[in-house]
Each structure stands twice: as C-alpha cells, then as structure tokens.
C-alpha cells in the first residue's frame, strides 16, 4: 500500500519495515519472517471531462526493490511476487489481460487474490521440496 502514496519515500518505507520487523522479532523471537513484494497496480489520473485514465504505478517497482534490499540487509526471506508475475514490464499488463483486476485498477477480483495465494503456496512447496531433497 505504501507505493500508492504519490509522496512515497524509500527511506520512510525502509524505516517503517525496520520498526515492524524489530517489533515482531522482539515479541516473537523464534518466528521466521517472510516478506513479500506487491503484485503491481495502476494509478489513475483525471483527464478532461472527468474521464479517468490509468498508468502503471511507477512506485511499485521502487517499493519492491526497497523490500528486497531490506530483506537482504537483514537476512530475511523474501518472496518477490512482483517479479514472479512479470516485474516492471509485465506485472500490470498480465493482471489486466487476464481480467483479474477490479475496475479501479488497484484491487483484484477474488480470482486474482486466489491466484496470488496459489503462487505463494507453490513457491513455499517448491522451496520445501528443494530443501528436503538436498
């Protein structure tokens, strides 16, 4: 959600993640933490005669990079959904072409959220299978 703010600030986002992770680690020291990146979305603009137009939200890629960097610097796990679903070039296009986004171009239809959950599930199962086979 941070990337939907047009005043998105990398440092603020990084520090907010740090506060949350430290709070979780202090409260639940033996629990693993998995960070995820956002799936991609659009932002809307008003055109003449109150017509809306949509463009890929450029801050999503920045927020995803911030999450990946934070995870790397703090030795946390991260599942990069943004990359899995197409990254900067295709994430939004893929969701739109599959007709899995709501008309606001930010939120997803139930089928879109189900797909996101299934992708995460498959990633976890694949990682576990790799772990037990090595």
Segments the model singles out, each with a brief description of its role:
Residues 11-18, 22, 118, 122-125:
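Amphipathic, non-transmembrane alpha-helical secondary structure
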Residues 25-27, 130:
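Surface-exposed acidic, glycine-flexible loop patches that form ligand/cofactor-binding
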Residues 1-12:
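Oxyanion-hole/transition-state-stabilizing segment in secreted/luminal serine hydrolases
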Residues 17-21, 25, 32-37, 41, ...:
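Conserved, well-ordered alpha-helix/loop/beta-strand core segments that scaffold catalytic motifs
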Residues 41-134:
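Catalytic His-Asp segment of secreted/periplasmic serine-dependent ester chemistry enzymes
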Residues 13, 24, 36, 87, ...:
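Functionally constrained cores in energy, signaling, and assembly domains
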Residues 28-33, 73-77:
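Loop/turn elements at helix/coil->beta-strand transitions in domains of secreted/extracellular proteins
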């Amino acid at each position: 959600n941070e990337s939907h703010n047009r005043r998105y600030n990398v440092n603020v986002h990084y520090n907010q993640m740090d506060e949350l992770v430290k709070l979780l680690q202090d409260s639940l020291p033996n629990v693993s933490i998995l960070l995820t990146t956002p799936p991609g979305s659009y932002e809307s603009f008003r055109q003449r005669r109150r017509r809306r137009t949509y463009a890929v939200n450029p801050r999503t890629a920045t927020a995803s990079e911030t999450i990946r960097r934070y995870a790397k610097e703090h030795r946390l796990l991260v599942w990069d959904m943004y990359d899995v679903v197409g990254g900067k070039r295709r994430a939004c296009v893929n969701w739109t072409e599959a007709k899995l986004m709501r008309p606001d171009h930010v939120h997803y239809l139930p089928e879109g959220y189900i797909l996101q959950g299934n992708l995460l599930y498959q990633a976890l199962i694949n990682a576990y299978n790799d772990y037990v086979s090595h």
